[in-house]
Amino acid sequence: MSEQTTTPEVDHTLELNNEMTERRSKLAALRAQGNPFPNDFRRDSLSGDLHAEFGDKSAEELVALGKQVKIAGRIMTRRIMGKASFATLQDMAGKIQIYVTRDDLPEGFYNEQFKKWDLGDIVGVEGTLFRTNTGELSVHVSTIRLLTKALRPLPEKHKGLTDQEARCRQRYLDLIANEESRKTFMIRTKVVAGIRKFFNDKRFMEVETPMMQVIPGGASARPFVTHHNALDIDMYLRIAPELYLKRLVVGGFERVYEINRNFRNEGISVRHNPEFTMIEFYMAYADYIDLMDLTEELLRTLAQDILGDTKIRYAKEGEEGLTIDFGQPFQRLTMVDSILKFNPDVTPADLATLESAKAVAKHLHIELMKGWELGHVITAIFEETVEHMLLQPTFITEYPAAVSPLARRNDVNPDVTDRFEFFIGGRELANGFSELNDAEDQAKRFQDQVNQKEAGDDEAMFYDADFVTALEHGLPPTAGQGIGIDRLVMLFTNSHTIRDVILFPALRPQQK
């Protein structure tokens, strides 16, 4: 008879099942004694606040203060030493050590209750602040209660939860186990709050526009389609709020912004998620140059207020990284100039005609679509050869009109627009332009987009007749911009993939 062996996966599953069985038995015993999930404990302190306020107090000063606290949190570590134990509790603000002794608790409680609790259980504690012999701020427990019994164990302390997909699927576990993840999403919250404060202080009005639309618009992207049963019509999840926000500017709301969720039925990558968050804003009586100035001010303010410095360290996965300085003026280059800068063998004449630009693209092995104009080819060359080279904050201006259906044409060269995209760390972070407010030109460009869609371009825009009607009522000179919040948080937290900064990113369902 051959010897049977088990794989590590089987061993782990068996171990997990055994531990869960034991924890369920403990829960059953707790139920027999009363409600094991009480909801009458109220804390008055958070761990981080206690460290901030009392972290510099000496042992003698803490004794003199006699500070009584009520805290609650999850048991992350525990050391049982006979009649006394140390444990670490984790709450929303951090961690703090508690000191529990048998003699401070009701008779029998320490051995029959406390010692049988598990890592991951949530407890409420009352006690006095003190400093241990090793100098650690701690709570000497006078009362402790079990508030929630955890039926599943925490990840192993040293292995943690390191698998990228597992962290995304079980974000709750990732947040419990990984301090860096908690910091990332705390910074994300601060970024959103900082953006909102910045625009509110400049007298922008926050608004909400439809997330389900009859005609998707505002960006070149493939939309998600749904069906509205009551109206019996197909609708589209928003790919951008732009056309609705500009309708509001027509209506007299001259400075508007929306922190919005957009949906694009496209690929998933380290910097793309089908559902993502942006800040999009519009201001009347401004142009794209004003927006570039505003963007510099915004990013500089956010970095200083949230990170405490205008210089940040950023590294893509596997790379050494670089220091990005928001304190210096941002570089500004036209698209053509940037191509010439990073492609020394290319001349201005090479980008002057469709045929010569196609020859450059062919030499660079860039795939082109049928029916593309000169502007499309130049943009493709830029995206393939320049975009990833833009590491320090850089505005790329003068985007071709062929790829900018909503932007105002440049007064000097109508083949390009008063548009920019902002790049940092080799990635696009923002897109802004002086808005096209010529209704007749907009109607023509919409028709060009329809022609491109009929020729097979799934990402070309739909014709939005109502938006053209709105422009016919008069849109004041306006500039508008969108900034990707997910990518900005990636930058501020030195995250390598967009999934690390979205709490619940899109994932394929697991097979059972």
Curated annotation (Swiss-Prot):
One of its GO terms (biological process) is lysyl-tRNA aminoacylation. The lineage of its organism: Bacteria, Pseudomonadati, Pseudomonadota, Gammaproteobacteria, Aeromonadales. This is Lysine--tRNA ligase. Binds 3 Mg(2+) ions per subunit. Mg(2+) 2 binds at E428. Keywords: Aminoacyl-tRNA synthetase, ATP-binding, Cytoplasm, Ligase, Magnesium, Metal-binding, Nucleotide-binding, Protein biosynthesis. CDD domains: LysRS_core, LysRS_N. It is found in: Cytoplasm. HAMAP family: Lys_tRNA_synth_class2. Gene3D superfamilies: Bira Bifunctional Protein, Domain 2 (3.30.930.10), Nucleic acid-binding proteins (2.40.50.140). Its cofactor is Mg(2+). Its main location: cytoplasm. InterPro entries: Aa-tRNA-synt_II, aa-tRNA-synth_II, aa-tRNA-synth_II/BPL/LPL, Lys-tRNA-ligase_II, Lys-tRNA-ligase_II_bac/euk, Lys-tRNA-ligase_II_N, Lys-tRNA-synth_II_C, NA-bd_OB-fold. It comes from Aeromonas salmonicida (strain A449). GO terms for molecular function: ATP binding; lysine-tRNA ligase activity; magnesium ion binding; tRNA binding.
